[in-house]
Amino acid sequence: MRTLWQHCHVATMADGRYSAIEDAAIVTSAGLIEWIGPRAELAPVEADRTVDLGGAWVTPGLIDCHTHAVFGGNRSGEFEQRLQGVSYAEIAAQGGGIASTVRATRAASEDELFASARQRVQALMRDGVTTLEVKSGYGLDLANERKMLRVARRLADELPLTVRATCLAAHALPPEYAGRADDYIAHICDEMLPALAGEGLVDAVDAFCEHLAFSPAQVERLFIKARELGLPVKLHAEQLSSLHGSSLAARYQALSADHLEFMTEEDAVAMANAGTVAVLLPGAFYFLRETQLPPMDALRRHGVKIALASDLNPGTSPGLSLRLMLNMGCTCFRMTPEEALAGVTVHAATALGLGDSHGSLQVGKVADFVAWQIERPADLAYWLGGDLPKRVVRMGHEISN
């Protein structure tokens, strides 16, 4: 079906800028953008349907490029404990922290994990999200990592949403491998990753590179295996300390390196040269009350593409609003509203390996967009909370009004 969408203004986000078109029109067909530009320049078109968008501002569908949306259990009790002065180490000694999420995720059935993840993902969708990434990493063994990745595939099958599934088996050390990190990495490389990739459950491979998780040398072994399997890589890096994990990620042409509060100028240069996207996660920064800011000036100076994401997870960023992350990116990290919107559209698409098809409104790209009843694009980062009036279109078909 060919649809003409008109009476709107468009922030195309081409090249990471608003690249605004006022009094615009969009023609979609077969799920793609067939034409976009000033309405006055549109030649007569035979459309099956014409939609008046009422003067709305149209942006690409929002992309949440870093989530841990599939998990069992709830850690709000730990949140209360931390606010009462209990340290993370004390909580962990009591069996809390990520270990509690691993236990709950292992105990949950696939259907239970799907039901809870569906609710969280639908909350993100209400903010205009049309594409997101879902990581595993709370199973930490083959059966349970498979279970999590199967849920990610089910979310894509049952919701009007594009989902990229990332294997994060190297998220933490499972209890059965206590004190044997090298053995666990070998297990991932030799057994888990080949099996999961062979089942078509993995779009990318991620790891957590930190003193409390895995070393750069251990991560590199995983990256070598991912390369053998033809899988792109990503990395949690420089969140709590500087191990130059982001430079390691760049050496393997990673799609992204994420967090990055402690990255150096040298890391920024490496990422820029490799085209690796910097994914900033202000929700975790806020929730943990951190003070070390990502080096925004270095990222800008060297031309590193900057994305924003929710980091939705039960322990450090239980955030169900990507629009809130736009505001946090501006207020916490001093991003401009234009940079923030690029961070959840065009640069987020690149961070998922979808830059050729998603993230900006251009001819030939997927017709995912949101028509917002706002005065200007900056309003998306300005308003805190609430459900802004909007119409969400995925692959040329309206999914909400």
From Swiss-Prot:
One of its GO terms (cellular component) is cytoplasm. 4-imidazolone-5-propanoate binds at residues 75, 138, 171, 239, 316. Its main location: cytoplasm. It is found in: Cytoplasm. N-formimidoyl-L-glutamate binds at residues 138, 313, 315. Its cofactor is Zn(2+); Fe(3+). Fe(3+) binds at residues 66, 68, 236, 311. Belongs to the metallo-dependent hydrolases superfamily. HutI family. HAMAP family: HutI (MF_00372). This is Imidazolonepropionase. The lineage of its organism: Bacteria, Pseudomonadati, Pseudomonadota, Gammaproteobacteria, Pseudomonadales. The gene is hutI.
